[in-house]
């Protein structure tokens, strides 16, 4: 394993390890109570395993996801990727990195969620992002060689001290309404993993990783696939350690019901409170500055990776507009949305993610299946269409806009996983229909 692979692996870790990866694991640990392990393992499944799979599947075709999705439908490829890139880009994920950075670096110092302070902070934050992203050829090196080592050292220090401070405590009762059995906890952890947005971000990051591997002189698809897999495993191991560690510490932190009620009444994010408490308990007044460094580095690396990926994709489909112009446009959009505040950004993203995630997971698995089992285009189109329509109606019903009895009666609906058995049935149906349709099996470009 050469130095380039390590740099790419660390870069991928840093791009994945952003705002949600910090605040969701300790929150999950607190809420899961006695059912921590099924919850955190499910969170790891959607927060790490699926993103890793998403990255390496993107290396199966010479043209990446653009080429693989074109096999399903060229129009679907463009529409789906635009939705993906906007979701994990300027509409939700990038603004969240800025608002999280503010809430965990500035708010503990000024003791308020001042909109003016947020405005000033986001201006400075996105100027730094702009500087790093303007030269895409240096993006990997700047993140992997400079920012990631600092991020790993600082967060490791906080995890070790947090474990020493809180591991002796017994786990709290947690949120018993959601976490009342092994299965309910697994299902809740699985859907909580959606909020990291990493499984759909993997589709975007795959392009950056594959391009970085190519820049090292590797051109054959099989070798690109192996290097991408190795880099992905490096990132995954680091993420698994950090997720479980932060979740475990959160699971053993004593937080009273009164404190939780106060946080909710002040619109404070509970995950950020847990991290702040962890840092201040372990390092005193210096803790908030240590946490600030961790958050700033984690969010900054993710924001840079996302801005770079989104801008490269849109420049590719609209070549008349330069990469730098797209960088400026998406940073401006992210700046505007970030100023709505952290909880607002998270709340806005949940319905969209509930539609996009099932489709993204289905697409990634269908591409992987087609690599090993002869698959016709119609066999991929049917499950994608069915899961997409089902996800839309599921969100409509969950939001209360229209009560759909059929949706509410589906298996696993109580756990927001009703799409999964439907996806399996739709995939089988697609293959049966494919038997009677005259189409050539899908072949991914290797050279």
Curated annotation (Swiss-Prot):
Pfam families: Branch_AA_trans. This is Putative branched-chain amino acid carrier protein SAB1263c. The lineage of its organism: Bacteria, Bacillati, Bacillota, Bacilli, Bacillales. One of its GO terms (molecular function) is L-leucine transmembrane transporter activity. The chain crosses the membrane at residues 6-26, 40-60, 74-94, 114-134, 143-163, 193-213, 229-249, 290-310, 326-346, 350-370, 382-402, 417-437. It is a multi-pass membrane protein. One of its GO terms (biological process) is L-leucine transport. InterPro entries: Brnchd-chn_aa_trnsp_Livcs. Keywords: Amino-acid transport, Cell membrane, Membrane, Transmembrane, Transmembrane helix, Transport. GO terms for cellular component: plasma membrane. Belongs to the branched chain amino acid transporter family. It comes from Staphylococcus aureus (strain bovine RF122 / ET3-1). Component of the transport system for branched-chain amino acids (leucine, isoleucine and valine), which is coupled to a proton motive force (Potential). Contributes to NaCl tolerance. It is found in: Cell membrane.
């Amino acid at each position: 394993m050469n130095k380039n692979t390590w740099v790419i692996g660390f870069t991928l870790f840093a791009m994945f390890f952003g705002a949600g990866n910090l605040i969701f694991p300790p929150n999950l640990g607190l809420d899961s109570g006695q059912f921590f392990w099924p919850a955190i393992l499910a969170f790891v499944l959607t927060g790490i395993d699926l993103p890793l799979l998403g990255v390496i599947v993107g290396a199966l075709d010479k043209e990446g996801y653009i080429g693989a999705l074109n096999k399903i439908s060229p129009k679907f490829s463009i529409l789906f990727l635009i939705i993906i890139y906007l979701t994990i880009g300027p509409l939700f994920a990038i603004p969240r990195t800025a608002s999280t950075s503010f809430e965990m670096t500035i708010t503990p110092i000024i003791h308020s969620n001042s909109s003016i302070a947020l405005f000033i902070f986001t201006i400075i934050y996105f100027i730094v992002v702009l500087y790093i992203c303007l030269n895409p050829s240096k993006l990997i090196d700047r993140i992997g060689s400079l920012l990631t080592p600092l991020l790993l050292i600082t967060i490791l220090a906080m995890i070790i001290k947090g474990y020493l401070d809180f591991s002796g405590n017994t786990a709290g009762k947690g949120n018993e309404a959601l976490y009342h059995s092994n299965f309910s906890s697994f299902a809740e952890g699985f859907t909580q993993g959606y909020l990291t947005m990493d499984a759909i971000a993997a589709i975007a990051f795959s392009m950056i990783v594959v391009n970085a591997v190519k820049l090292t002189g590797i051109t054959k698809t099989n070798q690109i696939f192996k290097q991408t897999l190795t880099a992905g495993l490096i990132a995954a191991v680091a993420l698994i350690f950090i997720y479980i560690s932060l979740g475990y510490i959160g699971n053993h932190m004593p937080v009273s019901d009164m404190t939780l009620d106060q946080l909710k009444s002040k619109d404070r994010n509970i995950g950020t409170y847990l991290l702040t408490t962890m840092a201040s308990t372990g390092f005193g007044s210096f803790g908030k500055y240590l946490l600030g460094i961790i958050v700033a580095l984690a969010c900054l690396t993710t924001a840079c990776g996302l801005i770079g990926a989104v801008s490269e994709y849109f420049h590719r489909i609209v070549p008349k507009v330069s990469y730098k112009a797209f960088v400026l446009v998406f940073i401006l959009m992210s700046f505007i949305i970030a100023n709505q505040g952290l909880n607002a950004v998270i709340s806005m993203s949940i319905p969209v993610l509930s539609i996009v995630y099932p489709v993204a997971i289905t697409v990634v698995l269908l591409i992987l299946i087609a690599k090993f089992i002869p698959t016709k285009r119609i066999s991929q189109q049917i499950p994608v269409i069915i899961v997409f329509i089902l996800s839309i109606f599921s969100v409509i019903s969950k939001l209360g806009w229209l009560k759909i009895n059929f949706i509410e009666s589906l298996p696993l609906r109580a756990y927001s996983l009703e799409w999964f058995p439907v996806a399996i049935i739709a995939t089988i149906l697609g293959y049966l229909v494919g038997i009677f349709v005259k189409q050539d099996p899908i072949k991914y470009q290797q050279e």
